[in-house]
């Protein structure tokens, strides 16, 4: 009886909560409920931390050079497109970089922002292949807590962002992240091309710095919200989530930076047989 009451209360709570969702995305892929993505991400974590390494234990690593080249440069093109769409749907056409509220109208610009937010959300599932490729290539040491946590928490939290607040100041970190990914995946793509392209990778040592700058800018931008008394942003809870996200990843990347460059435990490695040896993000 107690379980039945708990279930009923949970259903009522969910129904009351979901009524505030954005109706524009109700019928979009993966947007009806958080359950499908939770199942996908749960299996992802299980595969990359347990099942995958076991399946590959007595197998030779896959040779994925051509696949990696195609994948990385495809992500570059996709990221360029999303960056452009974020600019054209708000960040370059009217957003103030301060108190930018969500536009829930059916205007072309508002719908363009919603579509761009969903594309960014969906791109996070495509990027799960980063870890899958590590497993298939038997690069298990690259499957760090930072890597798995980042690839899991981003799509899961972004479902709620798209479902309730697709636009406004809460999308700044996505806008910035697409630009960073253009640089990062360009490096990975060039790296995958092989040793002949090493001369074009002199800037690899700046990748971690670029990500640190990204999280500093995200934290600074979102911190403004807490000092603006008249900001009418519709879902303040997302600002606390983004603030936590920025601080957590800033600390994790600072730890990585210290371990890799100060203590010298994990310096970036060059390519071997045309495949990148280091891919933390």
UniProtKB/Swiss-Prot annotation:
It is a multi-pass membrane protein. Disulfide bonds join 99-231. Its EC number is 2.3.1.199. It catalyses: a very-long-chain acyl-CoA + malonyl-CoA + H(+) = a very-long-chain 3-oxoacyl-CoA + CO2 + CoA; eicosanoyl-CoA + malonyl-CoA + H(+) = 3-oxodocosanoyl-CoA + CO2 + CoA; (5Z,8Z,11Z,14Z)-eicosatetraenoyl-CoA + malonyl-CoA + H(+) = (7Z,10Z,13Z,16Z)-3-oxodocosatetraenoyl-CoA + CO2 + CoA; (6Z,9Z,12Z)-octadecatrienoyl-CoA + malonyl-CoA + H(+) = (8Z,11Z,14Z)-3-oxoeicosatrienoyl-CoA + CO2 + CoA. Pathway: Lipid metabolism; fatty acid biosynthesis. The modification N-acetylalanine is found at residue 2. Residues 2-27, 88-115, 163-171, 228-236 are lumenal. It is found in: Endoplasmic reticulum membrane. It is an enzyme of class 2 (transferase). Residues 49-66, 137-142, 195-206, 258-281 are cytoplasmic. GO terms for molecular function: fatty acid elongase activity. Keywords: Acetylation, Disulfide bond, Endoplasmic reticulum, Fatty acid biosynthesis, Fatty acid metabolism, Lipid biosynthesis, Lipid metabolism, Membrane, Transferase, Transmembrane, Transmembrane helix. InterPro entries: ELO_CS, ELO_fam, ELOVL7. Coiled coil: none annotated. Belongs to the ELO family. ELOVL7 subfamily. Catalyzes the first and rate-limiting reaction of the four reactions that constitute the long-chain fatty acids elongation cycle. This endoplasmic reticulum-bound enzymatic process allows the addition of 2 carbons to the chain of long- and very long-chain fatty acids (VLCFAs) per cycle. Condensing enzyme with higher activity toward C18 acyl-CoAs, especially C18:3(n-3) acyl-CoAs and C18:3(n-6)-CoAs. Also active toward C20:4-, C18:0-, C18:1-, C18:2- and C16:0-CoAs, and weakly toward C20:0-CoA. Little or no activity toward C22:0-, C24:0-, or C26:0-CoAs. The C-terminal di-lysine motif may confer endoplasmic reticulum localization. Homodimer. Interacts with TECR. HAMAP family: VLCF_elongase_7. This is Very long chain fatty acid elongase 7. It comes from Bos taurus (Bovine).
